[in-house]
């Protein structure tokens, strides 16, 4: 029953946003993409979570979420460096939500992308990534879609497909899984 429901949602979305939309085209981009795509988009440098471990109970937490919870949303950790987040957690004595203690490891950046390699010779392999989102495939294939469809700007590209994230705490229902479906539609305008 679940797969039928999911497929119905995908079909309805595709029909509404791709087939019934004027000047909109569908795409099925690659799941494995060259590392240069992710470097150019900034993903290799910044698609990570700031993680801290509680030394007492060994639980792992996102530093930004600890700050948001402690400040009740009045502090924006997105504009803070790791050092500033550590300083806030220390100065405001932010405790572990599991055990209540205040004994943290330093923040470490946890890479959210799955990395693998392509090639048969070990010393000549190229690094590639499983896509953490589908949007980059739409951007990379913009000219291919425009040329093959003779589309004039503005036009849209829609895609339904799997994305993969190296979640540190998978299993938080449907929100923090390592493999999931995305439905994205990008509009390209002047």
How would you describe each model-predicted region?
Residues 1-190:
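TRNA-recognition modules of translation machinery and tRNA-sensing kinases, especially anticodon-binding
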